[in-house]
Amino acid sequence: MNSTSTIIEFTGEFWTYFTLVFMMLTIGFFFIVTSLVAAILNKLCDLNDHHTNSLDIRTKLRSDTQLITRAHEESINQSSN
């Protein structure tokens, strides 16, 4: 019985195309990953700004309420004198 084998020769041209395709796939992969990370960070920054702004609004409302209460107390004190 004769044994048959297949010989694959990797010529210089094969390695050139292999390297080119591998490089393109690697660059594409990093581009996709970078885009996803940028989108996630952008979304997180938007959420953080929303919470920061809502906290500022609550703080502003709280200080406005305190100012109104103090003004009301002063008017009561003036009317009682």
UniProtKB/Swiss-Prot annotation:
Family: Belongs to the orthopneumovirus small hydrophobic protein family.
Glycan attachment residues as annotated in the record: 77
Post-translational events: Four species of SH have been detected in infected cell cytoplasm: a 7.5 kDa non-glycosylated form (SH0), a 13-15 kDa form that contains one or two N-linked carbohydrate side chains of the high-mannose type (SHg), a 21-30 kDa polylactosaminoglycan-modified form of the protein (SHp), and the isoform generated by alternative translational initiation. Of these different forms, SH0 is by far the most abundant protein detected during virus infection. Tyrosine phosphorylated.
This protein's UniProt keywords: Glycoprotein, Host cell membrane, Host endoplasmic reticulum, Host Golgi apparatus, Host membrane, Hydrogen ion transport, Ion transport, Membrane, Phosphoprotein, Signal-anchor, Transmembrane, Transmembrane helix, Transport, Virion
Segments on the Intravirion side according to the record's topology features: 1-19
Self-association state and partner proteins as the record states: Homopentamer forming a funnel-like pore. Interacts with glycoprotein G; this interaction occurs on the surface of virion particles and infected cells. Interacts with host BCAP31 (via C-terminus); this interaction is direct.
GO biological process: proton transmembrane transport
Full protein name: Small hydrophobic protein
InterPro entries: SHP
Residues passing through the membrane, by range: 20-40
